[in-house]
Amino acid sequence: MERTFNNNFGLSDNLPGGGNPISMDAIEEVQVVIAPFDVRQTNFIGGGINAITKSGTNTFKGSAYTYFQNQNMRGNSIDGEDLGARAKESKTIYGATFGGPIIKNKLFFFANVEVEKQPQQVIKWRARTEGEQPDENNYISRTTLSDMQKVSDFLRDKYGYDTGSATNFPADEKNLKLLGRIDWNITNGHKLSVRYNYTKNTAWNAPNANSMDGGSGSRLYNTSRVGYQSMSFANSMYSQDNKVSSVSADLNSRFSDKISNQLLFTYTDIEDMRGTNSSPFPFIDILAGKDAEGNQIMEPYMSAGYELFTYNNGVKNKITSVIDNFTYFAGDHKITAGISFEHQLASNAYMRNGTGYYRYSSLDDFLNGAAPETFAWTYGYNGVSDPKAQVTFNQIGFYAQDEWNIRPNVKLTYGIRFDDLIFDNSDLQRNDAIYDLDFGGKHIDTGKWPKSRMQISPRVGFVWDVFKDNSLKVRGGTGIFTGRLPLVFFTNMPTNSNMVQNAVVFGTKYENGIAVSHDSRLDQLAGGMITNVDDAIKKFGLPTTIENPVAGSKISGVKDNFKMPQIWKTSLAVDYQLPTSFPLSVTGEFIYNKNINAVTLENINIKDPSNWEHFNGADNRLIYPSDYTYVSGKNAVVLTNTSKGHGYTANVTINAQPVEDLNMMLAYTHTESKEISGLPGSDPVSTWQGMLTIDGPNFATVQRSRYVVPDKVIAAVNYNLPFRHKGLLRKTSLNLFYPVIPLPDIASLIQMI
């Protein structure tokens, strides 16, 4: 049974579930594909990993295992330079598998459970006690424990809010994996496999370091809410909770010697949400008061409350997929035709200050009920408590291919695939204020997705067994592959359309500690905080519906003719089994890639530079005029395509088994990749600005990819030590893995089964 888990949204580097969604001990076989010329495989342009999970047999089998790793099991030097004392760290994994027959030869089961624990200390700092002095070397903050106790008691007595501990900050990371599989031999010609797996990963974090709204900038003056100058409480921490639930059913049918069919259904529910131990309550920053001259000290002293970026912050992704492959065997031909359907919904919720935000000038101001110097709240329109940006689409694919055994030692595979991506516009609302902006004749419509466009992927591949004994094989092919784009780049459009939620900020601005402007509405908050959003809306007469939408400074869009990424791949490889007394093979492979529809970003508010001047001499960069934009103060960044970019990979791999139970591998890979942009981020404006250019992001040229590793060596050794004890077969495996030449760090792992 094959199933691929994708990080569809793309806000993190990890796979769904915060890592591997399935335990390695539940996997029977892993297939890595880089250039498969089988048209049944799609939705990737770099590579794909397919996993076949273990199944039960007629024999009851079980295993128990544990992994342990700490700071002493990794290297500690680079180029001969010792990095000093290693911070304490540990990771422990416990797991078990069990499988067997329910009805012999008919019905089988397999189950796996795995738990991973990593003790963490995300907050090393502590508040100082009476008689202590602040000490950076020993992580003692200037904030006093007695002041923290005053704030905690005050919030409990006046508002009924529990701040959590001021001295204990538990933050252990936990991961749970469950998998169950049933295999049913319905008849000799029909077999059904059903799998369910669940993964949950929880990792705790300290509150955001210094981001804020209002005031004289977007940061708390380059300091941190937890550190030498300031402390926070345990309930202001937040967790990153990653959950994956997936079920799949695979029905394989053989109707005759010439006709077979595979029907595969999968449903996956992925959630990456923030969690907290806090009840809903405003987040509070308390500044350090005033200096001897009466000027405001622009540094934090203490924070409390529901972490300001956690409420309704998360990504949800639901995928339903149905695939049917029909195969007909006609002599030397294996003809396959298929259809695939995928429905996908992705939502992104992000409400900074979703429970309210207050910033006070000093501890005394806060405790005595003075007006705050900043107030902020983000809330959903029409009473919606969990507003979110959403994208929904259906993908329909049709394909056909023929595997032709031209000769007993030559096989040719050729086929074609058609994929159509259809977006659902009902998720969107047009912001007329954005649409009315004229960017040199171009407009951004936040009320519709790109039009449906069929994408075609023809492919052809071959395998030639030169001597008809598998000792020398030549293989290769060429074709087009269609992939996906992280969905965060789509949800940026409704997120930045100002049609989802309303953000309110009342602030005070300072220059050198002296207030130069003050929002008078802050004075209405003297006497105590408003802790309910409905009360805040009523008190300040805030809008509850979208009355007069405005265009923000950051505008996101998707070009109407946008296409999912496509790449043309060509590969040639040679596999050679050397005539030795033990298995020894060498593989050489070369892959060339050329972009057809790569993805990049364009700021359509930038004017045509054809009439702009250049610097003189060697530095002939463009000189931007003062009126280089169509609309002042706006960034209008849209997703678009480019055909620029190419690359290649050359690899040599040696595999050997010099003695029984000893497997060795050595591989060298050289890679070159040129592109316009690797999309280094998730925010459209910052990603566009982060493009490496000479004349500006809109005029970027092809350059080496920032993600390419030009040269890499991998070596691996695996040795199995089987032994029997009281009739039970046990095995000890020793694995050594040497990852990359620039990082001489050998990690060892011992597994007891």
Language-model features: where?
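Acidic, glycine-rich flexible loop segments
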Residues: 1-48, 54-232, 239-243, 257, ...
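Residue-level signature of outer-membrane beta-barrel architecture
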Residues: 34, 53, 100-102, 184-186, ...
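Short loop/turn motifs that connect adjacent beta-strands in outer-membrane beta-barrel proteins
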Residues: 39-42, 56-61, 103-106, 189, ...
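Hydrophobic, lipid-facing positions within transmembrane beta-strands of outer-membrane proteins
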Residues: 45-47, 92-96, 176-180, 243-249, ...
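Transmembrane beta-barrel strands of outer-membrane/channel proteins
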Residues: 64-70, 111-115, 194-198, 263-269, ...
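Solvent-exposed loop/turn elements at secondary-structure boundaries
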Residues: 427-457, 461-638, 753
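Gram-negative outer-membrane beta-barrel transporters
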Residues: 585-728, 737-742
